[in-house]
Amino acid sequence: SPAKTRKKLRGKRFVFTSAQNNTHVHSDFLSSLENYCEVNEAELLVGTFHYNKKGFQRGGEDGDWFDPKIRKYILDESCEVFKDLLWCGELNILPTAANPLSGFHSYTQGASGIVPHAKVQLESLPSPKHDPCRMLYTTGAVTQRNYVKMKAGLKANFHHVFGAVVAEVDEDGDWFVRQLICNSD
């Protein structure tokens, strides 16, 4: 079972975002996230995704790179953030996906999940009457817009959000998730 081998994060507050290969970060937004983490005693974690502008996918091969400014934050594996909340950093979903959470409703096996993706999305998942509610969140991205100027790329460019997700737990073990969205200021 993946749950038995899944790494458990240590801490009370985390900031999750995503980054595209071969793309520079939005420096001001990254600086804001780093400052937020310092002030709020949070850990910044970045999930990566691959997008090949030449029209075919070769994710992870030589020639792919990630901005050196975020390398120390990259976590591309499944982790338990808190009880019943998972970081799905192993997922590599194309940024052109119209509905990045499609097909993942049962992926977290009864837990809520945070998925690295450039589009911000939140979905409430069905759960039995007396069970806690389950949610799936996407993060937004810390990297610049960088898409092919074709239909799917133009739509992805429009929906690209400089954003992140904050997850924190209180002293009772209850966790809370909220989204951070970069504005033009």
Which positions does each model-derived feature cover?
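Extended recognition/assembly regions associated with phosphoester-bond processing machinery
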Residues: 1-185
